[in-house]
Curated annotation (Swiss-Prot):
Example GO BP: mismatch repair
UniProt enzyme class: hydrolase
Residues engaged in binding a divalent metal cation: D22, E23, D114
Keyword Ribosomal protein annotated: no
Residues in RNase H type-2 domain copies: 16-216
Organism from which the protein derives: Nitratidesulfovibrio vulgaris (strain ATCC 29579 / DSM 644 / CCUG 34227 / NCIMB 8303 / VKM B-1760 / Hildenborough)
Gene: rnhB
Lineage of origin: Bacteria, Pseudomonadati, Thermodesulfobacteriota, Desulfovibrionia, Desulfovibrionales
Places the protein is found: Cytoplasm
InterPro entries, sorted: RNase_HII, RNase_HII/HIII, RNase_HII/HIII_dom, RNaseH-like_sf, RNaseH_sf
Protein name: Ribonuclease HII
Segments forming a coiled coil: none
Classification via PANTHER family: RIBONUCLEASE H2 SUBUNIT A (PTHR10954), RIBONUCLEASE HII (PTHR10954:SF18)
EC number: 3.1.26.4
GO MF annotation: an example: manganese ion binding
CDD domains per record: RNase_HII_bacteria_HII_like
Length: 220
């Protein structure tokens, strides 16, 4: 059985070296789901490091620069809408997390994931290094209490926001730069007026309502 998620992980209980993992964009109607993995050094100076959702955009960008500078290693994983529709958002999120871990300069002996789910066996196996798999733990609220997970949440969010700004310049009329792909009233009105574009998740309710869309909403 997978390890039970924890609500808090006291510092004494943390492995000595681990990668914190978090995602951004899971609930959006458009754009990719992005995950980040971060290994922080034993000592670092990143005052105000916390869950990215509690920070202003300017503060996130400032912290992201500091994280990239001081991290032992960090990585980003991206899965685009076509694959999200094909394998579902839960599996796409797992895939993005695995991709983020695989691009780290050193394989982590352990990974701590924000939320209540760990990587399934078929995804975890892809992270094997010299026959060894990282241990893993899911920590509910980890982005607010584990600095490496907080750092991952910030890198994932800032990276994805910049991607959505770029997509806004390519796909006019949807307001991606403003709402970042979330299902705001403005975004839903744009979909109704123009129809979905190549960056929309066609299996999500609000983009193209159908039975599969309802299924997507129950997978996390």
């Amino acid at each position: 059985m997978p390890p039970r998620p924890q609500r808090l992980a006291p510092v004494a209980d943390l492995p000595p070296v681990f990668a914190g993992i978090d995602e951004a964009g899971r609930g959006c109607l458009a754009g990719p789901v992005v995950a980040a993995a971060v290994i922080l050094p034993q000592e670092y100076a990143l005052p105000g490091l916390t869950d990215s959702k509690k920070l202003t955009a300017a503060r996130r960008e400032s912290l992201a620069e500091g994280i990239r500078s001081c991290a032992v290693t960090w990585g980003i994983g991206v899965v685009w809408p076509r694959d999200i529709d094909r394998i579902n958002i839960l599996q796409a999120t797992f895939r993005a997390m695995a991709r983020a871990v695989r691009v780290l300069r050193q394989p982590p002996p352990a990974i701590l994931i924000d939320g209540d789910k760990t990587l399934p066996p078929h995804v975890l196996t892809s992270l094997s290094c010299d026959g060894h798999l990282p241990t893993q733990r899911a920590i509910i609220g980890g982005d607010g209490c584990i600095p490496a997970i907080s750092a991952a949440s910030i890198l994932a969010k800032t990276f994805r926001d910049r991607l959505m700004d770029t997509l806004d310049r390519r796909y006019h009329g949807y307001g991606f730069a403003k709402h970042k792909g979330y299902g705001t009233a403005e975004h839903l009105a744009a979909i109704a007026a123009h129809g979905p574009c190549a960056q929309h998740r066609l299996t999500f309710r609000g983009v193209r309502p159908n039975p599969a869309a309802e299924e997507q909403l129950t997978l996390w």
